């Protein structure tokens, strides 16, 4: 089919080029680079965030291939999850069927963008041949003591009707549903991520290719603190152990606070108090809530003073942190201050700031440095010295021990849902919890389930959960909880390493860690932390030799758009807002925010691709903004990208003399100037690619194309134009691969452009400095000329005659005077 002579028809170009690409990767021999974007949940439609993520990864993969690397660049589907169950309820379709339809739809959409995936490595976590391996891992974890079951207080999402891990609760609400989280006590399965707390912290120091903000977020989430446990005698006779990182503030203590689940509360039997405690449990750990509490009527005895400290149950004290009990020092801790003010408790100041430091203890706690007073043996000491002195004193009394505490808790992996991986154990009245025999894996989900009764369909399935105990053969029941879906995403990067799926130790140890991992920063303390833990757990079980899954992490920014509302305050889609504006209707334009379905500030990728083509969308997504920063969607910007591609196409359409062959060993001085500029841009662009400054690379190849436009206009040597065009097409191919491939074919390029070597900048052209020469006729300036500083004088004179030809006309030249680096003066008769 003839493509040229009728304008840029991106639909025909992209369809043809996509049919010709083949990025299958047979076997693992020679693979020396692994590029991976965080795999998507198959919702049915890709969004602009997907396009940005996967285009960044594609540029890196294509660039690495151009340097001769054999790149593993796979794709898969994070396919378990609640939306599939919700679809089953809403539309009466089985979650497996719904998920497969969505995968098929999104597969077509991703292929339409031109991502160079190894589709032969595609996987879906809902397939038995995937999750049978993680069921086996779980059995390994049980054997190694890394998995256990216990009754504990959990975060219950009343909308999704399931338990959430601490990491999945954001500001007291479910990370997906947004529902207010409730506290319930249930038997749950846990993984002992806390066993690796120090290893996870130490490993952060080795991750030089990770953003500092992500490492800091993980460090804070793990939350290693050095403190002490103090023993307080109490009025009920039970010792109260209190954890504190600030024992030096003990002289300022005016109360003790315990979590609403603390064992000491068994000594309080008042029904009204119990009702208040239930209310405290509901909002425990919610920093947005007022500091609420209930007076137990119990007292603790201050270990150093004749002071009784009332004991309160408080919502800001968590049972999972430390001992679940603290002493309150309102003068020097803001949470204690707020609680003391709310409950009319005493405030004792013990640290006094230096002269000139402004503070108001009536309004807030003072947490700065200063000198101790009202503190007996600490009086006159500074804060650091006082801490050591207090610990030594308490240790000598025998009521104190030093401890290391972590904010990190074991990972609760039980979910009360159907559409997840079954946990491979059974419950037997005689034998207790019994692991399923490995030869019986996978434990598959039943296909016929009833979603109409609410709750977990596996709980009330008539046959699936009823089995024989593998140990004693008596009647038993399967575990009906399924794995948290983060279980699947914590090891999928290892599954891609093997053509057969699962984990092949030899393949994984060869290909891991992933060289470039691309995804959103919102996964810093969920997926990224769990994946690091999983590597360590699998190493302990003998499956892997590596501890860190990702060598370089690129956290792409969000795609943002203005938020629109109508006069009634209802959200509007951008296209509806523009129509209303054209019709003269009132539209409120709000701030620019992350694209969100709930606020309707979304742009449908399929609509934009249909209108402008994949290369236009790719180019816009990668222009102007660094990958790690948010990008604001702009219709004007998309139009600009489209116009650039049209102009590029016309250049080749109108100049059939452009070819892929060239010899620029001996070119004119002025032409050499252009070629030098191209090679200098190539050097800078290659450096940008190495450091993932993709927006800078785009700017340089656009500057390079402007130089080519100028060359054609000015009649530069065809050999120089050809070399420049070959460089231009090769460096733009990772970004806009469809049009680059077609233009490469247009100039007679050999083979597929995506298989061509990345060009190297010529050193002889990089070191050449340019100078501007004034061209005069009879002493009067008529033009200027850019030449290499080392250019031969005769060559410069010849070029000067060309640029002065119009001024000279028919005049006869008598002499030409050349002052190197400055001027050429042409004298006529």
From Swiss-Prot:
It catalyses: tRNA(Leu) + L-leucine + ATP = L-leucyl-tRNA(Leu) + AMP + diphosphate. A motif ('HIGH' region) lies at residues 40-50. It holds the Pfam family tRNA-synt_1g. The keyword Acetylation does not apply. ATP binds at residue 597. A motif ('KMSKS' region) lies at residues 594-598. GO terms for molecular function: aminoacyl-tRNA deacylase activity; ATP binding; leucine-tRNA ligase activity. Keywords: Aminoacyl-tRNA synthetase, ATP-binding, Cytoplasm, Ligase, Nucleotide-binding, Protein biosynthesis. Its EC number is 6.1.1.4. PANTHER family: LEUCINE--TRNA LIGASE, MITOCHONDRIAL, LEUCYL-TRNA SYNTHETASE. Belongs to the class-I aminoacyl-tRNA synthetase family. This is Leucine--tRNA ligase.
């Amino acid at each position: 089919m003839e493509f040229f002579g009728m304008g840029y028809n991106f639909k025909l170009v992209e369809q043809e080029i996509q049919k010709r690409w083949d990025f299958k990767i047979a076997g693992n021999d020679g693979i020396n680079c692994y590029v991976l974007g965080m795999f998507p949940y198959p919702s049915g439609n890709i969004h602009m965030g997907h396009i940005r993520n996967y285009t960044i990864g594609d540029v890196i993969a294509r660039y690495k291939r151009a340097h001769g690397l054999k790149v593993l660049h796979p794709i898969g589907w994070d396919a378990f999850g609640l939306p599939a169950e919700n679809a089953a309820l809403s539309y009466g379709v089985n979650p497996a069927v719904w998920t497969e339809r969505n995968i098929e739809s999104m597969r077509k959409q991703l292929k339409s963008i031109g991502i160079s995936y190894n589709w032969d490595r595609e996987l879906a976590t809902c397939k038995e041949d995937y999750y049978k391996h993680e069921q086996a891992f779980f059995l390994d974890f049980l054997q190694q003591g890394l998995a256990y079951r216990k009754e504990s207080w959990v975060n219950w999402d009343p909308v999704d009707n399931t338990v959430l891990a601490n990491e999945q609760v954001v500001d007291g609400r479910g990370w997906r549903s947004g529902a207010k989280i409730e506290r319930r006590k249930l038997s749950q399965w846990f993984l002992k991520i806390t066993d690796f707390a120090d290893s996870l912290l130490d490993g952060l120091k080795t991750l030089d290719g990770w953003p500092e903000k992500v490492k800091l977020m993980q460090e804070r989430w793990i939350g290693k603190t050095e403190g002490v446990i103090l023993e307080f005698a109490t009025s009920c006779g039970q010792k109260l152990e209190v954890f504190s990182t600030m024992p030096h503030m003990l002289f300022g203590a005016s109360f003790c606070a315990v979590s609403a689940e603390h064992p000491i509360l068994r000594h309080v039997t008042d029904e009204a108090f119990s009702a208040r405690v239930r209310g405290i449990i509901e909002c425990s750990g919610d920093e947005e809530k007022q500091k609420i509490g209930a007076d137990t009527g119990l007292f603790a005895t201050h270990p150093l003073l004749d002071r009784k400290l009332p004991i309160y149950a408080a919502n800001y004290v968590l049972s999972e942190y430390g001992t679940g009990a603290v002493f309150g020092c309102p003068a020097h801790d803001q949470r204690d201050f707020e609680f003391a003010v709310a409950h009319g408790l005493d405030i004792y100041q013990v640290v006094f700031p230096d002269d000139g430091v402004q503070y108001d203890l009536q309004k807030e706690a003072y947490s700065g440095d200063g000198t101790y007073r009202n503190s007996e043996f600490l009086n006159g000491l500074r804060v650091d010295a006082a801490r050591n002195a207090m610990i030594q004193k308490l240790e000598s009394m025998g009521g104190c021990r030093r401890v290391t505490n972590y904010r990190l808790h074991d990972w609760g992996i039980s979910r009360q849902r159907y559409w997840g991986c079954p946990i491979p154990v059974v419950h037997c009245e005689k034998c207790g919890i019994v692991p399923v025999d490995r030869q019986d894996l996978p434990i598959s989900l039943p296909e016929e389930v009833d979603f109409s009764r609410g709750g977990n369909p596996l709980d009330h399935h008539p046959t699936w959960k009823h089995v024989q105990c593998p140990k004693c053969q008596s009647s038993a029941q399967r575990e009906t909880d399924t794995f948290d879906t983060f279980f699947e995403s914590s090891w999928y990067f290892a599954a891609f390493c093997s053509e057969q799926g699962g984990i092949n130790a030899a393949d994984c140890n060869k290909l891991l860690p992933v060289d470039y991992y691309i995804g959103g920063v919102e996964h810093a303390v969920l997926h990224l932390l769990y994946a690091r833990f999983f590597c360590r757990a699998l190493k302990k079980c003998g499956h892997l030799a590596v501890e860190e899954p990702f060598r370089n992490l690129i956290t792409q920014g969000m795609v943002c758009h203005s938020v629109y509302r109508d006069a009634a305050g209802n959200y509007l889609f951008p296209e509806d807002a523009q129509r209303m504006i054209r019709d003269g209707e009132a539209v409120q334009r709000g701030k620019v925010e992350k694209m969100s379905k709930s606020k309707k500030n979304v742009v449908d990728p399929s609509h934009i691709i249909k209108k402008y083509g994949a290369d236009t969308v790719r180019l816009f997504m990668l222009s102007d903004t660094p990958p790690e920063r948010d990008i604001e969607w702009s219709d004007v910007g998309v139009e600009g990208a489209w116009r650039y591609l049209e102009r590029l196409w016309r250049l080749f359409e109108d100049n059939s003399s452009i070819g892929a062959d060239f010899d620029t060993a001996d070119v004119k001085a002025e032409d050499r100037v252009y070629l030098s500029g191209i090679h200098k841009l190539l050097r800078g662009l290659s450096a940008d690619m190495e450091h993932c400054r993709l927006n800078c690379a785009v700017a340089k190849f656009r500057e390079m194309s402007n130089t080519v436009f100028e060359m054609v206009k000015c009649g530069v040597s065809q050999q120089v134009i050809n070399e420049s065009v070959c460089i231009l097409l090769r460096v733009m191919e990772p970004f806009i691969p469809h049009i680059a491939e077609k233009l490469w074919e247009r100039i007679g390029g050999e083979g597929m452009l995506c298989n061509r070597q990345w060009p190297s900048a010529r050193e002889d052209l990089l070191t050449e400095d340019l100078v501007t020469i004034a061209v005069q006729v009879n002493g009067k300036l008529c033009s200027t000329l850019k030449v290499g500083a080392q250019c031969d004088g005769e060559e410069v004179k010849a070029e000067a005659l060309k640029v002065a030809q119009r001024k000279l006309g028919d005049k006869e030249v008598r002499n030409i005077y050349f002052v190197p680096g400055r001027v050429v003066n042409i004298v006529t008769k």
